[in-house]
């Protein structure tokens, strides 16, 4: 099956056409949420601000850059406070500039002024840089292995034979952390095998196909998973193609999932 995605200029071709409202600091997450809700964009809450130190400063900075430059992103509005560790004006030049804008709350009339300007600028970005449909020559499929997956070898072989590039992340037992790393690897679709004691999850920028185990929790939440334990490789590939061509996953429909910025240093 051929895949038709969205051409996002320097970001490449994605399978979703998301606008990202990127709060550069915890203090701007509330305003970012209001703007995103008004214009139908994606945003996220996080706890990163003046308290991040050491290697987490470039680490979180690079994570924000990866988010903003992901192929599933159409355009970006960075919302900064003005006195944080990771400064919005320093972040913006590292993002695809033509499709990005910056608002600084302390320079834009406070929260209310930033909200009004943010809604206006987000709409202008969407209207001025409309995405064009384009054929996707290479689909990067991420595998979140938060639990043991008996048929992993057969799955990887099948996905590769189907023409997909496969990226695997299995460091964490909590899917959210693995999903963040798969995002940085530019995975456009993710297959998630959540831990038996964890519910299905998602990632706002990336469609996540959740495959259940036979644990009591997963059986109780069976309707929230896209596929059951024991689904064949052919069934997985068929669903990947459908999702890449626009069919929404269960997590996309329900709106579940968070963006978690990786942290290494304990800080206040």
Predicted features along the sequence, with ranges:
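Metallocofactor- and cofactor-centric catalytic cores in central/energy metabolism, strongly enriched
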Residues: 1-193, 199-268
